[in-house]
């Protein structure tokens, strides 16, 4: 009887220890993902350099009217208000490098954080178009 109790205690201890190890491994993986998908704030100049040197998706999170009034060339319009609990259709690749901007920087920060929460891995906020010293394109 004593051997059975000892064996049961040993088995329970092993089960608890292995459960803790698995939980820690899962937590470490979640932390690694969070580190990879961190919020990045960059200047307009840094964003411009990124556009020139690598493949990026420029995301304008202003309204349609603001976008039509002048936007960065090749920018994709994804209004901040439209970013919810589902991945925006205009941004199908969660691994793409996204450069997010708005008018002043408030909406771009909010949008960048929402995109990170949706699982996008490489999101850079470069603030507002009011600080963009380069050319804008107008629709029409």
Where are these regions (language model features)?
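Rhodanese-like catalytic fold shared by cysteine-dependent sulfurtransferases
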Residues: 2-8, 15-16, 20-45, 50, ...
């Amino acid at each position: 009887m004593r051997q059975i109790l000892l064996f049961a205690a040993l088995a329970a201890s092993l089960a608890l220890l292995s459960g803790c190890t698995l939980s820690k491994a899962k937590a470490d993986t979640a932390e690694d993902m969070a580190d990879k998908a961190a919020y990045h704030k960059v200047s307009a100049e840094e964003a411009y350099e990124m556009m020139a040197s690598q493949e990026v998706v420029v995301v304008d999170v202003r309204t349609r009217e603001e976008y039509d009034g002048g936007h960065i060339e090749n920018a994709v319009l994804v209004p901040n208000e439209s970013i919810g609990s589902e991945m925006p259709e205009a941004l199908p690749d969660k691994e793409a490098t996204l450069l997010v901007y708005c008018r002043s920087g408030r909406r771009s920060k909010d949008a960048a954080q929402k995109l990170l929460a949706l699982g996008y891995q490489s999101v850079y906020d470069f603030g507002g178009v009011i600080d963009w010293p380069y050319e804008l394109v107008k629709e029409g």
